[in-house]
Amino acid sequence: MSDSSELVMVAMSGGVDSSVTAMLLLEQGYNVAGVSLQLKSNNEPYGNGYNLKLINRAREVAAALNIPHYVVDLSDIFSQRVIADFCQQYSQGRTPNPCIRCNYYVKIGALLNKIQDFKADYLATGHYARIVSDENGTHLLRGADGKKDQSYFLYTLPPESLSRLMFPLGQKYKKDIVRLATNMKLPVSQKESQDVCFIPDGDYKSFLATRMGFTPGKILDTTGKILGEHQGLPLYTVGQRQGLGLASNEKLFVSDMNADANTITVAGHDQLYTSRILLSNFIWRESGIPLDTSGMIVKVRYKAAPAEVKKISQSGDFYILELASPVWAATPGQAAVIYLDDMVLGGGIIESGGDTI
């Protein structure tokens, strides 16, 4: 049992994971309070009340657990750091991962500062990831449940943040969490969280259309030949095949998008493989990038199969990742996260891929 004088604030959405997180901490003897995030400002059209539904559901769970529940307004920083960047990235023909920025700036970054107002000792979330401390520092590890592991979305968190965080589900499996919630009759939603919480209906086109114009442009092949016309860069992503409107005997995929020229380049499936990736905003969590990359792997998307890392080298403000075997459709704007066994070593944002890097 823990020291009951330690206050742990649990980021609660009313879902299974955060609700069981609060319950487990109570069982461990912590003084627990729930906190939900107000992320939608009154002048924002997105969400259709989705954020309010989450807050109300979290309040019901907190009442069932007999713990205090608070709401903190982080709508300004969410709008500035997450939504504005999301739109800007899409306008440049990139495919961002807003969850990574949200964790760093909002759900964990800003919330860690806010809970100081409540004199809280720790912030706990329902992420499936682990935190381990030893003589070499504090480390971020994969969650035990490989199918639910969320360490990919947390790779930017600094060690000083990890030291004030708890991930009680890190050693758990999703099926067991659902069973616990059912047995305790917690008033939770069994639905999985939305990929992008501020677009709960998944209609990216409508969301982006309220914030930017779509300018049609040319679709080219790799020789520069015009094959057709696209409807606007934000509507496409590297690796996309559907919706191109091209008549071709060959299956063609988006291989590159040039925001300056407002063009999309398409190529055959095999031409999207690359074993060299250029990364920006590179972060290395451990002490020094070793010359020996034996055992290191990288994920170039959350659901991507891992690829073996051959070499990591610096090129000005960027880093070049060389892989032992090629990956398909390394997408600008997505994160490439590097692991050694279960430990998150670092990562960066994909700028481009190809042998000419």
From Swiss-Prot:
Location, primary (coarse class): cytoplasm
Name under which the protein is recorded: tRNA-specific 2-thiouridylase MnmA
A GO cellular-component term linked to this record: cytoplasm
Similarity comment text for this entry: Belongs to the MnmA/TRMU family.
Localisation: Cytoplasm
Lineage: Bacteria, Bacillati, Chloroflexota, Dehalococcoidia, Dehalococcoidales
Gene3D superfamilies, per database record: Adenine nucleotide alpha hydrolases-like domains (2.30.30.280), HUPs (3.40.50.620), Translation factors (2.40.30.10)
Species this chain originates from: Dehalococcoides mccartyi (strain ATCC BAA-2100 / JCM 16839 / KCTC 5957 / BAV1)
Pfam families per the UniProt record, alphabetical: tRNA_Me_trans, tRNA_Me_trans_C, tRNA_Me_trans_M
